[in-house]
């Protein structure tokens, strides 16, 4: 077995900077897009369709073809090239519907919008196909699809292709993985797929991996509470060294609190710092990706700590005496 060793930015998802609250919505979206371009974020165009549905006619009508119904979503937003690549990869095995956040929602976790309404817009992707954007989180997008917006269920939920790996502890932050989890909560088999940061993003290998995962899930099925997390190394299509089924590894975060002062003298803060690393222990997702292999990792919604469960049952759980409230 290899030694536990830190890996420099193993696809480091990193945390994305939040838009300052004093910006208008349109300015924030424009600056976010510019920042993504500076970072090399692969962005595909997605334009709004003209016209507005009449109230009461807002639900799309989808005919049943007999092919699997596949819901595709992500957390990078509807304009992401990774989303388009995933949609195109899965069209060969099912009827694909794209429902994704209208803006980048990286690292939002399993956030669900309950205190305001959600709005859905029809969008046209770069290949001319129809998609739907939601002004909420990845979880919102999946919830909307399962709660009746399309009037039918789903045979598979595919979330990605995320630009940046989601390895080890990343899954607790990841909107990509959380979208797949929301599918599982709604009894839909699901997987999440992410690719390491790549100087010249090419999602060919990740698209092939997504197709293989989808076919396996549709053929073999998943038990209740199960989903699959897939991570693809940043290598050319011909350079990867196979597929490995792994366990989750250990992410090493290097977050720093960065304080700044605005023109009015009021301090504000960013969460920044160097990219995270990870421990490339043999058998983990980190080890597989470092060695140019695609990591396929099973995940379960049941987060019960089994070993701690036994210990807790040996502790003294006698409560303190209730306070005397008599006058």
Model-derived regions, located:
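N-terminal acidic, proline/glycine-rich, low-complexity intrinsically disordered segments
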Residues: 1-24
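A cross-family phosphate/adenosyl-ligand binding-site feature
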Residues: 2-3, 25-29, 33-34, 40-73, ...
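Short beta-strand segments
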Residues: 73, 99-101, 135, 159-162, ...
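Alpha-helix C-terminal capping segments
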Residues: 145-151, 178-189
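Short, Asp-centered acidic motifs that coordinate Mg2+ and/or phosphate
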Residues: 156
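Glycine/threonine-rich flexible loop motifs
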Residues: 165-174
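Glycine-rich phosphate/pyrophosphate-binding loops
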Residues: 184-206
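Electrostatically charged, flexible surface regions
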Residues: 205-327
């Amino acid at each position: 077995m290899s030694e536990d060793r830190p890996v420099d930015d193993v696809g480091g998802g990193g945390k994305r900077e939040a838009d300052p609250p004093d910006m208008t919505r349109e300015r924030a979206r424009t600056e976010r897009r510019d920042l993504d371009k500076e970072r090399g974020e692969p962005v595909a165009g997605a334009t709004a369709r003209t016209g507005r549905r009449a109230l009461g006619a807002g639900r799309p009508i989808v005919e049943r073809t007999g092919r699997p119904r596949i819901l595709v979503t992500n957390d990078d937003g509807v304009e992401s090239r990774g989303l388009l690549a995933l949609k195109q990869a899965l069209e060969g095995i099912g009827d694909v519907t794209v429902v994704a956040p209208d803006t980048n929602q990286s690292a939002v976790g399993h956030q669900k919008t309950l205190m305001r309404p959600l709005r859905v817009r029809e969008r046209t992707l770069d290949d001319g196909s129809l998609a739907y954007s939601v002004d909420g989180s990845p979880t919102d997008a999946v919830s909307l699809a399962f709660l009746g917006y399309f009037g039918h269920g789903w045979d598979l939920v595919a979330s990605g292709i995320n630009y940046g790996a989601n390895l080890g502890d990343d899954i607790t932050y990841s909107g990509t993985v959380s979208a797949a989890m929301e599918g599982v909560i709604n009894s839909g088999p699901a997987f999440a797929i992410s690719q390491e940061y790549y100087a010249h993003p090419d999602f060919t290998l990740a698209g092939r991996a997504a197709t293989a995962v989808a076919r396996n899930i549709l053929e073999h099925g998943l038990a209740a509470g199960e989903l699959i997390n897939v991570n693809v190394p940043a290598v050319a299509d011909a350079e990867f060294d196979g597929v490995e089924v792994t366990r989750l590894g250990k992410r090493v975060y290097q977050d720093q609190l960065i304080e700044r002062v605005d023109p009015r003298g009021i301090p504000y803060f960013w969460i920044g710092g160097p990219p995270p690393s990870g421990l490339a222990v043999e058998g983990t997702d980190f080890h597989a990706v470092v060695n140019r292999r695609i990591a396929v990792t099973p995940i379960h919604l049941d987060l019960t700590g089994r070993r701690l469960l036994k210990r807790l049952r040996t502790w003294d759980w006698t409560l303190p005496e209730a306070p005397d409230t008599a006058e």
